[in-house]
């Protein structure tokens, strides 16, 4: 496999989103307090996206298990990163957003770029494989 970096990328992405999701699922109030940000009026507004991060983390581990075969899932991961980055950067530029959200936006932007590179690398690898479908 030429794209040896893809498997570790998705393992890291799985741990990153999984740990972040579990943190916001288990101790959301403490995280908001640490950043001195008022939490939403109901924890479900935080826990639902936290659980989505855990689901995506599982998907990233599945991609890591067989990146070429599960290449189509990379697009869903890229979609997740766009869904977070777009509003975060939009509000950071146009109005205001608590600074606690911006380090994760920059991380997700980095993951988005790497996911795009992985998508193309896996496509080339699949095309070169004699067993490709």
Predicted regions and their residues:
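Hydrophobic alpha-helical segments of small multi-pass membrane proteins
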Residues: 74-88, 104-115
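Membrane-helix boundary connector in multi-pass membrane proteins
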Residues: 65, 86-103
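Short, Lys/Arg-rich, polar N-terminal cytosolic tail immediately upstream
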Residues: 1-5, 129-132
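Membrane-helix boundary elements
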Residues: 3-9, 13-44
